Amino acid sequence: MAREFTRNMLIMLGAIMVGVVIITYFIGDIINRSTIETMTLQHNVEIVDINSRNENFTDYCLQGSIKMDSAREVREIANYYFDFALYWFNNALVTSNKNLTAQSIDNCTKAMGQYLTAYQNFGKSRPYFEIAKNYTTKTQYLEVLGYYIGFSQAGQNITMLRYNASDYLRRAAENLSFGHMENVTALMANFTIIEQMVQGATQVYNEFRYQIDGYLFFSTIREVPDQT
């Protein structure tokens, strides 16, 4: 009886040990599976977050670039009208031809409208680049976004200066058509002061332009190099 009891006890202990091993295995397997599922979920969340940040960064950069490209193109059109306005004005000074002063006034008016549009578009582009900075931590990207923001500010500065210069030139042409030479002289003195300011603003503008045009992901606009 004692031997039979001992044998049964050994069998029970063996069965219990096997059961413990099996249970331990299943518990470990469940824990491992749970850990893997948790890591996979975290990984997927991180991927979604990265993709979302990349999409937002690209979207804001693209929208800002579209506004900026438009501003640059419109500024070139404004420069075209401005150059003709000054050309007709200088000829009118020599010939006293009212048709030429009318041409100057017309081109000044068109230039002012284009400069104002360019000014507004430069301003509209800046917030997109500022927001894009929230979606990247890369030093290079933050650096180039800083150039974009600086360029938009420089663009607003130069277009507003030229808007004011066009206004003085237009008023000078109007006074020239009436023969009010004292007014013409005073207005052209202010015009000259602003044009001197334009030269400094153009230098700053071009420095930012060369910086951003050096980056491959910037869609360059073939602007006519500024001579002033």
Give the location of each predicted region:
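Immediate post-signal-peptide N-terminus of mature secreted/exported proteins
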Residues: 31-109
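Short, charged, amphipathic alpha-helical segments
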Residues: 102-113, 145, 188-189
